[in-house]
A protein has these predicted regions:
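Residue(s) in the substrate-gating loop at a strand-loop-helix junction
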Residues: 115
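A glycine-rich helix->loop->beta "capping" turn
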Residues: 26-29, 49-62, 68, 76, ...
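The beta1-alpha1 cofactor-binding region of Rossmann-like NAD(H)/NADP(H)-dependent oxidoreductases
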Residues: 13-14, 34-45, 77
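Active-site helix of classical SDR
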Residues: 95, 131
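Substrate-binding pocket helix/loop in short-chain dehydrogenase/reductase
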Residues: 71-72, 76-81
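C-terminal helical subdomain
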Residues: 155, 173-266
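Active-site-adjacent segment of SDR/Rossmann-fold oxidoreductases
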Residues: 101, 120, 136, 141-151, ...
Length: 269
C-alpha cells in the first residue's frame, strides 16, 4: 500500500505498517513495501525483497488502485492514463515480476482485481471500468500460458467499504460491506485447490460468479449478410439457447467457420 490518497496523490507507510503489525501480532511474518506499481523498476525491487526474505513467491494479489471519477465528457486524458497505469499496468508489472519465479518453481496463484464498474458499467468511471476489464483480458490469456506450470489466475470483483470507497457508499451499506467479508473469496482463489479463469464477486457476505458467454448465433446466406439481414435475424443471433463460455479465443473462429461450411454445404450437418 503506497498510502496515497484516493486520487493517487501523496504517499505514506502507515496503512501498510499497520497490516504488518497485525500479522506479526498473530505470529506471522510480513514486510511493508511502498513501491509504485506503475513503475516496473520499483516493482522488481519489491519482489526481490520478498525473494531475499522468503525465497519464493507463491501468491500475488493485484489490488492497487486509485480513482479519478468524472464523466467521459469532462474527464482529462491524463487522468484516464493514470488510472490505466495503476490498475492495468500495475497488475501487468507485478505479474511480470513474479511470472518467471512462479514458472521456475512450478506453482503460482494470481488474483487480479476487477470491478462491477468494468463488468457492467458505472456512470463517471469510464477510465476505471476500462482498466478493470483490461485485467480480465489479461487473466484469460495468462491462464492459457501458465497452465502447464500450475499457475492459476482468477479475478475478484469486490464490493467493500475501504479507504477508497469511503464517502461513496451510504453509511448503512458501508457498515455491511466490510473487507472481512471479501477476504474468504480471495483466500479461496489463492488456495492450492483454487479454480482457474473465474471471476468471483464478493461483498457483505454474499458471493457469485460473473461469466462472459457467447450465444450460439446463426449463419446467414450471402445475400442476407447485410445490416438488414442482421436486423431481421436479431432474435436468433441474440437467443440465449445454446450459449456457452468459450475456453479460448480460437473457439469463435472454429465455430464460425464450421457454421459457414455447413451452410454452404461443404460438410454434412
Amino acid at each position: 500500500d503506497l498510502g496515497g490518497g484516493v486520487d493517487g496523490s501523496g504517499a505514506g507507510s502507515e496503512a501498510a505498517q499497520s497490516v504488518v503489525a497485525e500479522i506479526e501480532a498473530l505470529g506471522g511474518e510480513a514486510i511493508a513495501n511502498g513501491a509504485n506499481v506503475a513503475r516496473y523498476d520499483e516493482v522488481e525491487a519489491m519482489v526481490k525483497q520478498a525473494m531475499d526474505k522468503w525465497g519464493r513467491v507463491d501468491i500475488l494479489v493485484n489490488n492497487a488502485g486509485i480513482l479519478r471519477d468524472k464523466s467521459f465528457a469532462k474527464g482529462e486524458l491524463d487522468d484516464f492514463k493514470l488510472v490505466l497505469d495503476v490498475h492495468l499496468m500495475g497488475s501487468v508489472n507485478c505479474t511480470k515480476a513474479c511470472w518467471d519465479i512462479m514458472r521456475d518453481q512450478g506453482y503460482g496463484r494470481i488474483v487480479v482485481t476487477t470491478s462491477s464498474s468494468g463488468l457492467y458499467g458505472n456512470f463517471g468511471q469510464t477510465n476505471y471500468g476500462s482498466a478493470k476489464m483490461g485485467v480480465i483480458g489479461m487473466m484469460n490469456t495468462l491462464v492459457q500460458e501458465g497452465g502447464k506450470y500450475d499457475i492459476r489466475v482468477n479475478a475478484l470483483a469486490p464490493t467493500a467499504g475501504t479507504r477508497m470507497t469511503e464517502g461513496l457508499i451510504p453509511e448503512e451499506a458501508f457498515a455491511l460491506l466490510t473487507p472481512e467479508t471479501v477476504t474468504p473469496a480471495v483466500l479461496y482463489m489463492v488456495s492450492e485447490n483454487a479454480p482457474n479463469k473465474t471471476i468471483i464477486c464478493a461483498g457483505a457476505g454474499a458471493y457469485s460468479i460473473a461469466k462472459i458467454v457467447e450465444t450460439d448465433g446463426v449463419w446467414l446466406q450471402p445475400e442476407d449478410q447485410t445490416p438488414e439481414g442482421i436486423a431481421a435475424n436479431w432474435d436468433a443471433i441474440t437467443s440465449p439457447e445454446g450459449e456457452r463460455q468459450p475456453e479460448a479465443g480460437f473457439e469463435q473462429t472454429v465455430k464460425f467457420t464450421g457454421k459457414a461450411m455447413e451452410g454452404l454445404g461443404l460438410v454434412d450437418k
